[in-house]
Regions:
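Active-site-proximal, glycine-rich beta->alpha crossover segments in alpha/beta enzymes
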Residues: 1-7
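Histidine-acidic metal/acid-base catalytic patches
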Residues: 11-19, 23, 33-133
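Helix-loop segments that flank and shape redox-cofactor active sites
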Residues: 30
């Protein structure tokens, strides 16, 4: 149901986004796993691909939040940055470190699972062309 509602919403707003040149972007779930039984919609590569293909429009994009994505040990931010750079409309550079039990903490930009140097290299052209980072 959550995905159907998201597709409906995106389908409804994309004509307006096209008309006014507005890029919409989804922020990955933070954290990228269930908490208290709440559903998640964008937690991994498959979810991002579904989201971008649900309404395949260049105005429908991704907020590349390295922190949210790196909080899930199943995600490799370096690969995600390469794969989804063209549809990334906003970049949020933060990093995390894994803790026992699936927990995580914020980490410095040069350490942690965010791999910010490598991820930034893949997103470089997009970052340079973007008004907001």
């Amino acid at each position: 149901m959550l995905r159907e509602n998201m597709r409906y919403f995106l389908s409804a707003i994309m004509p307006v986004c096209e008309e006014y040149g507005v890029n919409m972007c989804v922020h990955p779930d933070d954290p990228p796993f269930q908490v208290l039984g709440l559903p998640r919609i964008v937690t991994n590569e498959a979810d991002i691909a579904w989201f971008l293909n649900a309404v395949d429009n260049p105005h429908n994009g991704l907020t590349f939040c390295a922190g949210s994505l790196s909080a899930g040990e199943h995600n490799d931010t370096r690969e995600l940055a390469k794969k989804f750079a063209k549809r990334t409309h906003f970049v949020h550079l933060r990093s995390t470190a894994a803790m026992p039990g699936g927990n995580f903490i914020e980490s410095s930009h040069l350490t942690g699972r965010g791999h910010l140097i490598d991820s930034s290299a893949s997103l470089r052209k997009k970052i340079r062309d973007c008004l907001c980072v």
